[in-house]
Amino acid sequence: INWKGIAAMAKKLL
C-alpha cells in the first residue's frame, strides 16, 4: 500500500 494510492482513493471516495 502506498501513501499516494491511499490519497488517490480517499480523494475518489470524497
UniProtKB/Swiss-Prot annotation:
**Gene Ontology MF terms:** toxin activity
- Primary location recorded for the protein, binned into one broad class: secreted
Q: In its UniProt record, which GO terms are filed under biological process? A: defense response to bacterium; defense response to fungus; innate immune response; killing of cells of another organism
Compartments, as annotated in UniProt = Secreted; Target cell membrane
Task: Supply one GO CC term from the record.
Answer: membrane
Q: Which residues carry this modification: Leucine amide?
A: L14
**What is this protein identified as?**
Mastoparan-X
Q: In which tissues is it expressed?
A: Expressed by the venom gland.
Q: Report the sequence similarity comment from the record.
A: Belongs to the MCD family. Mastoparan subfamily.
Keywords, ordered alphabetically? Amidation, Antibiotic, Antimicrobial, Fungicide, G-protein coupled receptor impairing toxin, Immunity, Innate immunity, Mast cell degranulation, Membrane, Secreted, Target cell membrane, Target membrane, Toxin
Signal sequence interval, chain numbering? none
Is Acyltransferase tagged as a keyword?
no
Q: Pfam family example for this protein?
A: Mastoparan
Q: What does this chain do?
A: Antimicrobial peptide with moderate activity on Gram-positive (S.mutans, and S.aureus), and Gram-negative bacteria (S.enterica), as well as on fungi (C.albicans, C.glabrata, and C.neoformans). Also acts as a mast cell degranulating peptide. Its mast cell degranulation activity may be related to the activation of G-protein coupled receptors in mast cells as well as interaction with other proteins located in cell endosomal membranes in the mast cells. Activates G proteins that couple to phospholipase C. Does not cause hemolysis to human erythrocytes.
